[in-house]
Amino acid sequence: MILLFLPVLGLAVVHYLVAIRRYGILSPDGLFVVCQLLMLYGTLRLINPASDTEVFYGQLMAAAIALYIGASLVTYLWVKHSEAASAKPRVTYSAYRVSLVRPTPTILAVVVISIVVTAAYFTAVGYSAFIEGLRGQLNGLPADIATLRLESYAGNAYFFPGYVNQFKNVILPSLALVLVVWSFSRGGLLARVASIALSAVALLALMATGQRGALVLFLLTVMVYTFLHNRRRLPRAALLVPVVIGLPLMLLSTYVLARSAGSTESPIRAAMNDLFARFINDNQVSGLAAFNYTSGSPVRNGGEWLDGLAGVLPGNRGSTLSAEVFYTMYGSTRGTSPPSLWGSIHYNVDTMGLILIAALLGVLLQLLTQRTMRAASYNSLELVGFSGVTVVLGTWMAGGLETPLNVGLVAYLGLWYWGSRTSSGQRHLSRRSTALTRRPLPRPAFAGMVTGLAYAPRHSSRLRYGTWRP
């Protein structure tokens, strides 16, 4: 089955040489292609050739990814042809300026609200899984982090964790990033110290529930932001972000959450294996199990998606598919095993629907890549919003339509829109200031009225005060 990966990989290489290398892998289209290749490779490694259902699943996934790449490539060529045929000047992907957003009262108010919401949530729950795990490790009595984590999200008491996550995992760290960039570029010592403290609070909030997915996604968002801030170039110093920040936090969480308990591996190796499993194994195992589970069920015609979207509403548990699949794998409902993106599409709209949606995704993500970041200037708030949208859509490997919403798509879109409104206001003020400086100065009302004085204007396109003569 692994040979099925090679033609898709070859098509992806062609797509990279023609299109992706122009705008970079850290774009909605580029990141989606990379993640889907990882998903396909990891899945094909697990497929049992003797199972017709699993073989069909592998073929279905390979065909869907190939259709996506083909549609994306055709869309890219169409956009380039349209630009070449038009009289408009060609726009490059890196011809823009970046301005920094300062800590306005509105931004600071949203930061405070995010901190209050996060603190109120953990106060209501009564504990932080991360802090309890750290306390247990220090005391020599490791806590049952899996149970604590599950109780905080799906216990008897419901404290709207999905809504809290929008503040805790998206808005707070994103605004902290904006303020850190401003303080180290324009601010003084006090501003830098305050931004570092805010960053520490944001990182603790990301890790507090004992789930590292949000941390990994935001570190990737920081990488995309750095790439865009430097006009689609990734400085070598930016590569230190995963090493200097990501690796220590992954090691700490591995130690605190006791993921390597009973293992003779070093914490570094355990963290690396855990990260490898997250991208190459875990989602693939879950997706394969979900497809085996749903293959004998009738097509839902979008019903399971509607259940999942209804789960966004307060108090609604949403779709139970992931919990049902988890039960078939582990004999317990105290966890979730979501289907893959393509498995979810097939379960909801069958094979023909999957073909259409795969092609549609290729068109939409390519247009998102092409039609954004083409203005003359952007600000840091816009960039962090677009970076988050890029990561949320680009890493969409598992789950249905509710998955991007749960991991912050709407919140990042809101930050993007907020930043664009800020830029529009700045451009309006800039044009108004320019118009005022070009307006002729009025003649003084007292000119020629004071006895013994006369006003002698000079001949120029702008009236100026002349010389006073007795």
What are these regions (language model features)?
Residues 23-36, 189-195, 372-386:
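Membrane-interfacial loop-to-transmembrane alpha-helix junctions, especially the N-terminal start
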